Amino acid sequence: MSKSSRIRMKSRTRYLIAILLVISLCSKASSHDDEKKKKGVTYDGTSLIINGKRELLFSGSVHYPRSTPHMWPSIIDKARIGGLNTIQTYVFWNVHEPEQGKYDFKGRFDLVKFIKLIHEKGLYVTLRLGPFIQAEWNHGGLPYWLREVPDVYFRTNNEPFKEHTERYVRKILGMMKEEKLFASQGGPIILGQIENEYNAVQLAYKENGEKYIKWAANLVESMNLGIPWVMCKQNDAPGNLINACNGRHCGDTFPGPNRHDKPSLWTENWTTQFRVFGDPPTQRTVEDIAFSVARYFSKNGSHVNYYMYHGGTNFGRTSAHFVTTRYYDDAPLDEFGLEKAPKYGHLKHVHRALRLCKKALFWGQLRAQTLGPDTEVRYYEQPGTKVCAAFLSNNNTRDTNTIKFKGQDYVLPSRSISILPDCKTVVYNTAQIVAQHSWRDFVKSEKTSKGLKFEMFSENIPSLLDGDSLIPGELYYLTKDKTDYAWYTTSVKIDEDDFPDQKGLKTILRVASLGHALIVYVNGEYAGKAHGRHEMKSFEFAKPVNFKTGDNRISILGVLTGLPDSGSYMEHRFAGPRAISIIGLKSGTRDLTENNEWGHLAGLEGEKKEVYTEEGSKKVKWEKDGKRKPLTWYKTYFETPEGVNAVAIRMKAMGKGLIWVNGIGVGRYWMSFLSPLGEPTQTEYHIPRSFMKGEKKKNMLVILEEEPGVKLESIDFVLVNRDTICSNVGEDYPVSVKSWKREGPKIVSRSKDMRLKAVMRCPPEKQMVEVQFASFGDPTGTCGNFTMGKCSASKSKEVVEKECLGRNYCSIVVARETFGDKGCPEIVKTLAVQVKCEKKEGKQDEKKKKEDKDEEEEDDEDDDEEEEEEDKENKDTKDMENKNQDM
């Protein structure tokens, strides 16, 4: 090649390099622009697409006002470790704007801090804005002052209501935007909800209901925040808003989105039933919850939210009428933020199993086969690949069924679904729990409970207030959500010859009330009490009363247990005495309701003076504990309980009232309202450690007791633990889903040892000190209540003690060889174990400590691997759309 040719070649090479460099830079710029365009959340008929990536969303409801900022980090950490990637919360209008135009975002109400903390922990947020939330929360989250806005009607096409709602919505969303908390700004909020379960009331408002719901949808969409919006239980969710399901079994009850390009979202999967005073205990099994989740995802579901994941506490006066202070205690994280096992662990495992199916669920084609009256297979296959995931379902509630799928037999326990992420390997069954179980215990703090000395201050009973009305006033209007109490007084003159002559006849005072409770005094003497219930707020007080000749003064204390939280025309709900009469007079029944002067006084003296605070307590004269009359305040000081365990106060032989610690409202208690089982609905009441001062310091406890004759001596402070842990694993169960991982389209084992194991772990810093029960055979019962069957391996306890005592973590192979057992070959055997954990003084055996640490690190590595695998599997939206178009 000549010199000139070489020069021309070099020149062309340089030119080509320059061109390629320009193309590369343009490509990078374009790629960068594409990434910027991907920021935010969109959706299609398959799922939400977050920052360009599809996600299976496992969400849990955690309400910031129902726990404390001190508790938030632990709760969010446990949610993340439990397999959640999203936290859902309502926004509580009435705590943020208790008075019109005056806002509160401090302490438990610091919404921004809560959302930022969730973001720091790597989770998404779903924000349910209201304005109405229900949530068994006082007034459904609507501020009381809204009732007194002229011409207002809630939740309809009413200008005053819409005006205040829009101002509130713009206030909250403006705060979120200013703090850059929306996903489109790089924040965690991926989804918003406006209104709540509106279909339940829409018919009551006729065409104005439809107009209102369209107005609400337009309001949030017009703000262009870069996230989708949902309406739950709103079949006709307008425009681009997604209609979502609430319920226990949305996989079977939800007809699906109202447009084919909207994803299937489940905003409330109820983990239990909320409780009201007078209720017996209720629960929802984790097997049923897991079944519902697997069923939903097998039918094109891509998002589930557990309502609640942590219920927490209705502190102060925040609960709706008759709702207990403890809220959704049977959730995966209980009232105290402790893991309720096996609910916590078994749901963690279903999340992991479903994540192993993600490729097939997003990019596979659904096929379904009905194999019998109760059995079904639903599976997703991606054409041209080996990607496949199957859900084998047995809906029979009594019988086990065997089915054949792709040439292989599978045994399905009753009412269960098996998940096969590769259409071959069972990694999880909803009815077979390999996760740990636990039992909660309340242990009396002897040091704190000992020697409590109470002082008392009794309320003055107003005998006759200045008459301000000819009829009794409405109780909500009188109290204005500032207090639960309002006095009604009137007088009646009875002539001597109007009393009955016949022996045994007495005059009766009858008070018909719209709710919720009342206490009656006649001439300053206690005459009795009465109350309604959640299902029937109205009730009647009717008792014989010793009226005197001449003027008689009647004092009635109307009592609320919270404001209503649901239904149409909430602004027109009423409570309090509605009809008052005296029966048994010679002259006949005397009606005192109308044309009788009634005086009214909202609140109690102790409330107005804030005797539950240190400063306020100095404004009244406290006396030594003596005769325990109704409407009495009791005060004592107690030392902060030892250790770090959660704390509660046990109100065993008390009646009904309110509790404060260091001036902070713990909540309403009601021990005298017994369930059909003859027990109070709630006995222990949570006192967060952040409400108390440091260890060994004194705290002020104040109790307002409405009823007479209570036993203060029965009050205890208790420490809460879940130090009793159990395992209950059948030898025919699949190995833990944590034993599997995905490599491309394949599901492969994580380790060489793939034997089924019963695994238990004590709380941090504790070790197993006692094996309380062990049986490999046919034991019955549950954690805390196991019973030996007829066939149990003789070495059961010996084997468990050898493997577990002195350790924080232990695993036992569930096999006959482990126990040297050849008996009862005809039965499928179960290993049931119950052990006690304690914090032991002195050093743990170093070998066991190292083994425990290795096991813990292995668990953490499993979680990290799962996240890495998810990252590999995520593809951008364009690729997924191209794939769908090709199909």
UniProtKB/Swiss-Prot annotation:
Q: Which GO terms describe its cellular component?
A: apoplast; plant-type cell wall; vacuole
Main location as per UniProt: secreted
Q: Which residues are glycosylated?
A: 269, 300, 395, 785
EC primary class? hydrolase
* Region (Disordered) residue spans: 838-887
Q: List, alphabetically, the InterPro entries matched.
A: BetaGal_gal-bd (IPR048913), Galactose-bd-like_sf (IPR008979), GHD (IPR041392), Gly_Hdrlase_35_cat (IPR031330), Glyco_hydro_35_CS (IPR019801), Glycoside_Hdrlase_35 (IPR001944), Glycoside_hydrolase_SF (IPR017853), Lectin_gal-bd_dom (IPR000922)
Keyword field contains Secreted: yes
Here the segments flagged for biased composition (Basic and acidic residues) are 838-852, 872-887
Q: Where in the cell is it found?
A: Secreted, Extracellular space, Apoplast
What is the catalytic activity of this protein?
Hydrolysis of terminal non-reducing beta-D-galactose residues in beta-D-galactosides
Active site at which residues? 197, 268
One GO biological process term = plant-type cell wall modification
Acidic residues bias spans? 853-871
Q: What molecular functions are annotated in GO for this chain?
A: beta-galactosidase activity; carbohydrate binding
Q: Which UniProt keywords apply?
A: Apoplast, Glycoprotein, Glycosidase, Hydrolase, Secreted, Signal
Q: Describe the location of the SUEL-type lectin domain by residue ranges.
A: 752-838
**Signal peptide region:** 1-31
**Record-listed E.C. numbers:** 3.2.1.23
Per the record, the similarity remark reads: Belongs to the glycosyl hydrolase 35 family.
Q: What is this protein called?
A: Beta-galactosidase 14
Tell me which species this is from: Arabidopsis thaliana (Mouse-ear cress)
